[in-house]
């Protein structure tokens, strides 16, 4: 059993640092629908994916999806990334969901292939090695909510509007919504929300457990982003390998029976034993000082 579990688990692997960091260092970034930012100073270790397609309210079109996959592949190889935030550069919108105007021009075969690609995108987000946070400062509908559901943590403005509304358009959630929403809220409630296509405010979503935090919106329209940053800053000082292995243990363990889940936890724990960070944590405790984790 342990051998089978070990062969199927995806553990964090060594990463290569990016040659270029920060949005301003890329002169072509301004015209892109997806921009990658690496924060500096006390926020070093926090990376951001900025979704910026104002003409279509960050709808999930072909170019948008391609650039998002490219950004994830880039960040996955960066060992300096300890937390990844998904945010919007379009005021009042997180992600409006699928680009239905673009999809209307597709053949039935093309639609099937594109939705399969969307499903793969959400899987890549869910499998990202470091913790991910969705900062939902506005509408997150259909695929937009599916994107947020693929993240580990969600923060929303109280006034944000979200829902899996596909049934109101003659569709059903096709990018993970039918699977991740029940795992988040339970089967009966997920069915009710999907069958009715109901929209929820950020405050309602928090009451149901769909988002971790709901905050009052500010004049700039980025209150959820600031709360997401504060949450990321809480994660930053913790041992990055232990955090990533905790993510693996939770994500894989929740899919199996508890005995298999305990075995997965044991495998993850064994991976952490030889790390320098574990020794540093014990030394810091003994010496009554804050630990300095380096991710090794």
Swiss-Prot record:
Broad class of where this protein is predominantly found: mitochondrion
Secretion signal span: none
InterPro entries for this protein: ClpP/crotonase-like_dom_sf (IPR029045), Enoyl-CoA_hyd/isom_CS (IPR018376), Enoyl-CoA_hydra/iso (IPR001753), Enoyl-CoA_hydra_C (IPR014748)
GO biological process, alphabetically ordered: fatty acid beta-oxidation
Key words of the record: Acetylation, Fatty acid metabolism, Lipid metabolism, Lyase, Mitochondrion, Transit peptide
Taxonomy, superkingdom: Eukaryota
Modified residues (N6-succinyllysine): 101
Site residues, Important for catalytic activity: 146, 166
Residues spanning the membrane: none
Gene Ontology cellular-component terms listed: mitochondrion
Molecular function per GO: lyase activity
UniProt feature coiled coil, ranges: none
Pfam families: ECH_1
UniProt subcellular location: Mitochondrion
Residues recorded with modification N6-acetyllysine: 101
Family: Belongs to the enoyl-CoA hydratase/isomerase family.
Name of the featured protein: Enoyl-CoA hydratase domain-containing protein 2, mitochondrial
Gene expressing this chain: ECHDC2
């Amino acid at each position: 059993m342990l051998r089978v579990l070990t062969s199927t688990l995806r553990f964090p692997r060594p990463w290569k640092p990016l040659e270029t960091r920060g949005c301003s260092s890329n002169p072509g970034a301004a015209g892109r629908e997806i921009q990658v930012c690496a924060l500096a100073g006390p926020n070093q270790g926090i990376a951001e994916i900025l979704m910026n397609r104002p003409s279509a309210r960050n709808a999930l079109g072909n170019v948008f999806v391609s650039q998002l996959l490219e950004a994830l592949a880039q960040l996955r190889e960066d060992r300096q990334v300890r937390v990844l935030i998904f945010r919007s550069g379009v005021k009042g919108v997180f992600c409006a969901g699928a680009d239905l105007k673009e999809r209307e021009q597709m053949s039935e075969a093309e639609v099937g292939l594109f939705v399969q690609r969307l499903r793969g995108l959400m899987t890549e987000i869910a499998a990202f090695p470091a913790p991910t946070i969705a900062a939902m400062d506005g509408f997150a509908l259909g695929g937009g909510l599916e994107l947020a559901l693929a993240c580990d943590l969600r923060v929303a403005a109280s006034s944000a509007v979200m829902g899996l509304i596909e049934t109101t358009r003659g569709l059903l959630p096709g990018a993970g919504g039918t699977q991740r929403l029940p795992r988040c809220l339970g089967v009966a409630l997920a069915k009710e929300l999907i069958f009715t296509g109901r929209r929820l405010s950020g405050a309602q979503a928090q009451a149901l457990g769909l988002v971790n935090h709901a905050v009052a919106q500010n004049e700039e329209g980025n209150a959820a982003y600031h709360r997401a940053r504060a949450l990321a800053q809480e994660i930053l000082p913790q041992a990055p390998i232990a955090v990533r292995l905790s993510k693996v243990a939770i994500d894989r363990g929740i899919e199996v029976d508890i005995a298999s889940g305990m075995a997965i936890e044991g495998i993850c724990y064994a991976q952490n034993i030889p790390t320098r960070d574990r020794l540093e944590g014990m030394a810091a405790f003994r010496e009554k000082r804050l630990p300095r984790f380096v991710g090794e």
